Structure formats: C-alpha cells, structure tokens
C-alpha cells in the first residue's frame, strides 16, 4: 500500500502497524486453502464417519461451517457458534487460538446421510458473515461389498461354431461405480452388455451382464470367467466361473470297417465312434435291417481335449450267409436324432471255402447220413433175408 505524497510527515508507528496488519491479512486471504483430502468416504450404516478439513491460514477472521450439498438448498451440518447438532462432534478443540483443523465426526450413520459434504470458510462481517472460500467436497457413500458373481449358461447344449450367452449377476454393492470384465480361458472378451440398477440414488445396487461366446470344438475343457472389481474390495476382484462343458455338445463321427477273418467262419466288423461329448451314447447293430443283440466287445476312451471315443466290435458268422449282407452301426448321442453308418459285408470265395471246411453244420451232417444209408441198404437187405 503506497504512502500518499500529500502527507507532510512520515506516518507514525501506530499507522505503520495498522498498514502492516492489513497487508498481512490480504496475503493470508490469498494463501488460504481449504483441504478436504478424501474425495470419497465409504461408510457403514450405524457406524461413525469422520470428515476431514484443515486450513492453511487463520485469515480472514471468521468461522468454518459444514454443509451438505451446494447452492441455496444446501443443508447446514455443523456450526460451532449456533444450532444444535447432537450427532456431530469436532475432532480437535476449536477453542484453541491457532487451531487449523475443522474436521468433524458424524455418529450413527443412516442411508439418509449420503451426499457431498463441504467445509466453508466465512469472513466475519456485519451484520452477517460472508462466504469466503469452500473446500472441494467429500462424497459420503454407503460402502457395501458386491456379492460373489453368479454365472449362468444356456439351458440347452449347442454344437460348435454356434454362439451361446452367459449371464453374470452381483448384488448389494454401494457406491454405484463398479467394473465388470469377461474372460474365456484367460482372454478378455468384448462382446457383452452390462447394466447397473437402479439408475438413481439408492442404498444398494445390482449389476447384470450378458456375454456372447462362440463355441469351438475343443471347448469341452474351456471356462468363462466374470470378474467384478469394486472400491470396497480389498485385494483381488471377485470372480464367477462357468464351464463350457455344460453348454457344448460335440457330435460324433462314425466309421464302420471290416477286419480280416479272425477264426474260422467269423468276420469281425468294427464301428468307431470318435470325438463326441458328452459321454451319454447308445450304440446298436443291425443286420439287413434287423436289430442284433450280440456284441463281442466295446471300449470307451477319453481324449486329451475332453471328448470321447467309443469302439464296438461285432462278429458275423459267414458260413451260411448270402452275399448281400448289410451291417448298420447306429448311434444315438445325448438324446439327439440317431446317426448311422452302413457296411456291405464282403465275403470272398476263399473265405467261403474256409467256412465250409471248418465245422460241418446240420445240413452237411444230414447229407452224410443219407449217403451212408444209400450205400449200406443193399447189404442190409440180403443179410436180413438169410436170417
């Protein structure tokens, strides 16, 4: 503040002190900062919440008040000089001369207490104090952890190359901000939609997300993971999983082959059912359209990708077979329509000769008896007449 040139004499000590105090107050006002370190404060119903506020200067002279909200409709939360605030106490002693801590505690928190709180500095005035500076505000929100995510897959199985939907739900969290991600075998998915309800203010929120996944033939051992991250969680996010083995059906492939003749008049025919899932499978043999009950043996093996192979052996007696024998291997998998594979039996002349030389059947035995009767008949009759 410059000294007017019209003054005939230098100012006295009292005037200099007044000018110095004025300059100090202006500098203090310019340096004043209202510090509210927490942008978000998560609280629990029934507990006590502490709202921090410190100042960097005691100037200008005047009180510090607490409000919830801004504008004309803001709510007065605490005033040291006036009003009755039974649930609010100060952290420090505000009566101390050099106190710069105006933090408060609010006890018995209820859902109605959520909102943004501001500590505001007023300049002392007459007849009323004038608002001078406000802190940035601290949002108080009810902190509630989300429930463990639950992942649900499709109601029915689907074959590879088709798209299926998985849903993920989590409930009861607060505040509303939450992050949800989808993964398949560790790879993040992008085809999903997420909704958080309700859209307005609430005590607790729920999230629901639906992801679309294209099934691959090797997905029997695959997993989808729903990952939820929230400010109330300490450490890793929450995860829910679903196995694609519950959603996929891999249809089998069939192959019927005729093996070299094993013993005598028997031909071994093999039906190989490959790469199917799930395990439930029914296999039947038919010969020229007639269902056969006999089956020599069968084996079930599991592949590395989780699918299965089934091998069935069927023995055919060719000693009295015609040349037009057709064998059919029919498979009904997981309640689906049956699929089948046919094989026309090939019997060579050599195999027929082997079968006829192997073991005499009823017809050949009867022929031998008739020949013996014809040869021995004339001998038997004279011998009978002599006697």
UniProtKB/Swiss-Prot annotation:
Location within or outside the cell: Membrane
UniProt xrefs under SMART domains: IG, IGc1, IGv
Domain Ig-like V-type: 29-137
Known tissue expression: Detected in liver, and at very low levels in brain, heart, lung, pancreas, kidney, placenta and skeletal muscle. Expressed on CD4+ T-cells, CD8+ T-cells, CD56-bright natural killer (NK) cells, CD20+ cells, and all activated NK cells. Mainly present in the paracortical T-cell area of lymph nodes, with only sparse positive cells in the mantle and in the germinal center of B-cell follicles. In the thymus, primarily expressed in the medulla on mature T-lymphocytes that have undergone thymic selection.
Broad class of the protein's primary localization: membrane
Topology relative to the membrane: Single-pass type I membrane protein
Segments on the Extracellular face: 29-360
Protein name in UniProt: Signal-regulatory protein gamma
General function of this protein: Probable immunoglobulin-like cell surface receptor. On binding with CD47, mediates cell-cell adhesion. Engagement on T-cells by CD47 on antigen-presenting cells results in enhanced antigen-specific T-cell proliferation and costimulates T-cell activation.
Gene Ontology cellular component terms for the protein in this record: membrane; plasma membrane
Domain of life where this protein originates: Eukaryota
Residue intervals annotated with topology Cytoplasmic: 384-387
Positions of glycan attachment: 243, 268, 309, 317
Membrane-spanning intervals of the chain: 361-383
Signal peptide range: 1-28
Disulfide bonds: 53-119, 168-226, 271-329
Quaternary assembly: Interacts with CD47.
Annotated keywords: Cell adhesion, Disulfide bond, Glycoprotein, Immunoglobulin domain, Membrane, Repeat, Signal, Transmembrane, Transmembrane helix
Domain annotation Ig-like C1-type: ranges: 146-245, 252-340
GO terms (BP aspect): cell adhesion; cell-cell signaling; intracellular signal transduction; negative regulation of cell population proliferation; positive regulation of cell population proliferation; positive regulation of cell-cell adhesion; positive regulation of phagocytosis; positive regulation of T cell activation
InterPro entries: Ig-like_CS_Receptor, Ig-like_dom, Ig-like_dom_sf, Ig-like_fold, Ig_C1-set, Ig_sub, Ig_V-set
């Amino acid at each position: 503040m410059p000294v007017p040139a019209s003054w005939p004499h230098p100012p006295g000590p009292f005037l200099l002190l007044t000018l110095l105090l004025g300059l100090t107050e202006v500098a203090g006002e310019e340096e004043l900062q209202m510090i509210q370190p927490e942008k978000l404060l998560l609280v629990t119903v029934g507990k006590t919440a502490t709202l921090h506020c410190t100042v960097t200067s005691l100037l200008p002279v005047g009180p510090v008040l607490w409000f919830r909200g801004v504008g004309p409709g803001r709510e007065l939360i605490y005033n040291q000089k006036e009003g009755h605030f039974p649930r609010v106490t100060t952290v420090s002693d505000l009566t101390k001369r050099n106190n710069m801590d105006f933090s408060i505690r609010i006890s018995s928190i209820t859902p109605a207490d959520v909102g943004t709180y501001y500590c505001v500095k007023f300049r002392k005035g007459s007849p009323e104090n004038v608002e001078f500076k406000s802190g940035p505000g601290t949002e108080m929100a009810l902190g509630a952890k989300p429930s463990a995510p639950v992942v649900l897959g499709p109601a029915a199985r689907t074959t590879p190359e088709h798209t299926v939907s998985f849903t993920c739900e989590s409930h009861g969290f607060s505040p509303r901000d939450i992050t949800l991600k989808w993964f398949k075998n560790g790879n993040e998915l992008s085809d999903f939609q997420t909704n958080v309800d309700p859209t307005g203010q609430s005590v607790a929120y729920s999230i629901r997300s639906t992801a679309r996944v294209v099934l691959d033939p090797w997905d029997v051992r695959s997993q989808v993971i729903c990952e939820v991250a929230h400010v109330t969680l300490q450490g890793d996010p929450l995860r829910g999983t679903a196995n694609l083995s519950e959603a996929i059906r891999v249809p089998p492939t069939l192959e019927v082959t005729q093996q070299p003749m094993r013993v005598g008049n028997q031909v071994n025919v093999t039906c190989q059912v490959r790469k199917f899932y799930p395990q439930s499978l029914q296999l039947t043999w038919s010969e020229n359209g007639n269902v056969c009950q006999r089956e020599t043996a069968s084996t079930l093996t599991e592949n590395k990708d989780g699918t299965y192979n089934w091998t069935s052996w069927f023995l055919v007696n060719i000693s009295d077979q015609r040349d037009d024998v057709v064998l059919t291997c029919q498979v009904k998998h997981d309640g689906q329509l049956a699929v089948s594979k046919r094989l026309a039996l090939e019997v060579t002349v050599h195999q027929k000769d082997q079968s006829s030389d192997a073991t005499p059947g009823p017809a050949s035995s009867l022929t031998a008896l008739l020949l013996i009767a014809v040869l021995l008949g004339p001998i038997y009759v004279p011998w009978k007449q002599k006697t």
